[in-house]
Structure formats: structure tokens, C-alpha cells
Amino acid sequence: MYGAVSNNEAVNNAGAINRAIDDCASKGGGRVVVPQGEYSTGSVYLKSGVTLYLEPGAVLKGVHDIGAYAPLQTTLDLSRYESGQGTVNYNSATDAQWSKAMIFAVGISNAGIEGKGCIDGADVRNPLGEEHMRGPHTLLVAGCKGMKFEGFSVKRSANYAFLAYQIEKSKFTDLSIQGGWDGIHIRGAKQVEIAHCEMHTGDDAIAGGYWERMSIHHNKLNSSCNGIRMIMPSERLDITDNEIYGPGTFEHITSHRTRSEAAINLEPGGWGKAPGRMDRIRILRNRVRSVLTPLSVTLSDDNTMGSLLIEDLEARDITRMALSVKSWGRAQTDRVVMRRCNMEFQGIDDPSLPGWFDNRPTSEWPVFPVWGMYFRNVKEVDAKDVKLSVKGKDYRKPWMVDNVEKHNLHLL
């Protein structure tokens, strides 16, 4: 009816798919069904009230012509979300190369994509893109409310599988993301849920920031970078019941490594200025293995943090870095509470390592002066029923506090 042609890479079906979506929206909304078969396409635009439904065996596959992908068009001011200024990783929503995407949802509500089919980004490269190679994002969502993405798989993303700006009351559930760079990257969110997803990504599995009432739960995250990386401050963030592990199944495309970094990395300002306060962060019942560190929190000078609660964290085969909550400048955290945590670290068998830190500036530290937990510039640390163990030999102390006003550490 709309002229889509399956299993023919020479055909760009974007026109047919967009006609079907427009027709559905003009009739009050509903479902646009993509049947079994592979449909090559450039940029597709979702509309309010329309669900794009991918039947089992249905594949939307990106065409290899970079000219078939449009950049983001929006009147939203997204300048606060820019990052990486002055580097090859500069990210700006106004950059016509960075903001290209295969599927757009812009300024719409009560729409999404569901089903058991697949979206294949086809690893389309763009010599004018980020790092002179990254292509279009697979899905780009901006200024939307009530979005639902459920059940389907995304593979071979040419940049992020999902990039979102300023979204509200939206859900990402039961998704499979394989390969590419970041999995779900959201800059600006209110009441957003990421749940029951499985990701094997070359870059961060979940990333972004300026989140409010974000819930990340019951996911399996495997990454050759960070499992969860927050680069802009957030409030009321719950990270619960996730399994985060390394090494990565898919290599980091830029560096070719498969080593996993932090399971959870909260570093506002890590990719450029991101002023603001973090507060009411809860990290509960997460299972971590074979990563660099279970948790790294680093505040920049224009950040502060209220409360951080860590409960029932199980971490095994931590390869190099202690759990840490810190700032290297003036920024302070009010309170860190830990309960019932059990963490095992690989030791560094070097008797000279403890003395190496004497009179060394922190900027030269390759690891921490301790192997288990490190706290710096925190008003209060309250840890009970925390077990730290080391595999092999290590001559450093298990924990350290630096410029901590009050601490109560009850270790098992």
C-alpha cells in the first residue's frame, strides 16, 4: 500500500515508511506494522500517537549513503548538554554531522517502537562525523513525553543506539543492544525508566546526565568502557538490581580495547562543564564482576553532592581500582552511607607501591594508595557490614579517608 520493498538494499524505504506513519497519525494514531523482511532505510520520523511495531523477523536496516540521513531539526535550546568542546569528541545537537540519525522522535508524545524485530544501524561511517568516522545515531529522541521503546533489538549502531534530549515520563524496557558505541545515552530526563534490557556495547552502556527521578533497574550491562556513566549531575537517581560485568563482548571501536572500566561512573563535568548538585543517589542490590572499579564518584569544582546510599553491592574480580567517592578540588559530598557490601579486589603484588605515593600529587596517581575504598572531601562516611577482600598480595591499606569530617567504618 505504501510501496515499501523488502530484501533489496538498493531501495531506500524511508519515503514509504514515513508515508505510513504520517497516514496513521492523520487518522488519530495507532500502530504501523513492519512485517517480516529486511527494509533498508534512511531517516524515519515518528509521530505523536503512533507506535512503530516490528514483527518477529522484521529488520529496519540503515542504508550506506550518509546523505540519506538528516540532522536533528528542533527549536529546543539544547546548548547546556554540549560536551567535549575543543576535542574530536565534541557533541552538539546543532552539529549537522553529530545529530544525524536513522530514526527521529522530535517534539512528540505517546509514541514509540515495540515488537520483537530488529533495527540494524549497519555501522555506517561518516568521515565528517565524531572522531572522523562515527555515523548516524540509530534513534534520536528530543523534547518528547510518554515515549515507549520495548522488546526489539538494536545492532551495529554507527554511533549511539539511542540518543535522547529532554525527555519525560518515558520507558526503555526489554531491549537488546549489541555493538556500536553508547547504548542508551540521555541528556536531560524526568521520570525515565531503563529496565530489563541487555546491552553489549563498545562504549558506555548507559550514559548522559541531568537526570531527575531516573530509574535504572534489572539490566544486564556489558561494556568495553563503563556500564553506567553519568557526565552531568542528577537527582533522585536509582540504580538497582543490575548485573554489570566485563570484559566487553564488543571492542571499543575507537581504542580497540575490551577491558571494562567502571561498573558505575558518576563524574559530572567529566566531558566539559556541567554545573549543579547531585543528591539522593541510591545504588542498591547490584552485582558487579571483572571491571576496573565497582563505583567511581568524582565531583568537579562546580558540583556538590548531598546523599549517596550504597546497599547490598556484590563485586568480584575488581581488576585495579578501589571504590571511590571524591573530588580533587573543593567540591564536597555531604553523606555516604554503605550497608551490606561485599567486594573482592585483585591485589597488586608490589611491596614498593605504598611508599611510591609519598609526596606525589594526586594528578600522578595511577591507582589509589589503598586497594578497597577511598573517600575524599566528604563530610560523613557511615559504612556498616562491609566486607573487603583481596585476591593475591597487596601491601597497601584496605581503605582511606582524606578530608572527611566524620567517619564510622564497620568492616567485616
Residue ranges, per PLM feature:
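Extracellular/periplasmic carbohydrate-active domains that bind, remodel
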Residues: 1-412
